[in-house]
Design a protein with these regions (language model features):
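A gly/proline- and charged-residue-enriched helix-loop-helix capping module
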Residues: 99, 105, 109-130
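Class I S-adenosyl-L-methionine-dependent methyltransferase catalytic core
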Residues: 1-72, 76, 94-108, 134-148, ...
Length: 365
């Protein structure tokens, strides 16, 4: 059993897991999910910060029982001959365990290990939870002698799990910030969200087809600077992209060439208006994944008339795109699309596109 600590948008992270592992995912409190599988690569997930293998399940456990389990197990591990110096971090989620109590557990592991002839380095806690950056930079879960102990409680159940890795925020930042072409005006879709969208769509497609896809074919019809296509390429997908703006087509081509380290990689990127374009390969697609037109950017809440104008324009463009592509893709093609919404802080509401309520009339379920 694998425990996943969900990210800043836990509902999206949960949906991603449910798409990839249908019937095997159980929500565990507000911050985590349990996946009934033997192994998992955290780097293939966008919506989970950490992954850990469940070691102990306790019920109605007090801090003394939790502490004893951890101290006894990891003090003995420190004297294993096949391991060099043991590095341990401890995180407690929803566990009503204070930072001072975590520090006491760490100190006890270190003291007992020393008595047994072993050495342990304990990563200091400023809070009950070690942040993802700390886990990643200390390589916790990536080596047998570098572990993060995760304690998490939900209702009467306490899980003690041992990390198998944290999200590689260094690689994600590099793909986001050092690619040659970026454009804040057309949107800055984070690689983590792009990866989540890819997994949601491909997971759904695999469920529909009832088979694992070794090289899924995906299209981003609003490709922008190519973030979704980058993440799809890294997962072995055959990528196609179009954009109304020739500048964005060029940006995507340059970014993919940078990612692949090859100008010779065969790109299927071209200019095209998503509301009327014909994709000759559409029937071969496994998924359509995109961040659609987001409308005019605002620095502050627009007046109601302006907002309705922008909302209507976006609704029209996206509806026409959905109608256009529906006539070209096969019935087993999955779609995952991001569309705009506008938060009005003055009246504490979110304005959404009308098409959401009428998606079935566009031919989708």
């Amino acid at each position: 059993m694998i425990l996943c600590i969900l990210g800043r948008q836990p509902e999206l992270g949960l949906t991603e897991l449910e798409s990839l592992y249908p019937g095997k995912v159980t929500r565990f409190g507000s911050e985590a999910a349990l996946v009934n599988i033997d192994r998992l690569d955290i780097q293939n997930l966008g919506g989970s910060q950490k992954a850990a293998r469940v070691v102990y399940n306790l019920y109605n456990a007090k801090i003394s029982e939790i502490s004893h389990k951890i101290i006894d197990s990891y003090s003995k591990r420190a004297i294993r001959k096949d391991l060099s110096k043991l590095t341990i971090g401890i995180s407690a989620y929803n566990a009503n365990i204070k930072t001072t109590q975590i520090k006491k557990i760490g100190a006890a592991i270190k003291f007992n290990a020393k008595k047994l002839g072993g050495t342990v380095r304990i990563i200091p806690n400023n809070d009950p939870v070690l942040n993802t950056a700390t886990s990643h930079h200390n390589k916790l879960g990536l080596r047998e002698n570098k572990k993060e102990i995760i304690i998490i409680q939900h209702n009467s159940r306490t899980i003690i799990a041992e990390s198998i890795g944290a999200q590689n925020i260094t690689a994600l930042a590099k793909r986001d910030q050092t690619r040659p072409k970026r454009d804040a005006f057309v949107g800055m879709l984070p690689p983590k969200l792009a990866l989540m969208m890819y997994n949601m769509a491909i997971g759904k497609s695999q469920s529909i087809l009832n088979k694992k896809l070794s090289q899924p074919a995906i299209l981003d019809p609003f490709c922008g600077t190519g973030v979704i296509l980058q993440e799809a390429y890294l997962r072995g997908a055959k990528i196609y992209g179009t954009d109304l703006n020739p500048k964005m087509v060029n940006y995507t081509q340059q970014n993919i060439a940078w990612l692949t380290k090859s100008q010779a990689y065969k790109l299927h990127i071209q200019q095209g208006d998503a509301t009327i374009h014909t994709w000759n390969y559409a029937n071969e697609l496994n998924a359509v994944i995109c961040e659609t037109y987001l409308g005019q950017p605002f620095n502050s809440t627009p007046n109601p008339t302006k907002l309705e104008q922008v909302k209507g324009n976006c609704n029209n463009i996206i509806s026409n795109f959905l109608k256009n592509i529906h006539s070209q893709i096969n019935q087993k093609t999955a779609l995952c699309i991001a569309i705009p919404a506008w938060r009005d802080t003055e009246i504490n509401t979110i304005h959404r596109l009308p098409l959401i309520k009428h998606i079935d009339k566009l031919g989708y379920n």
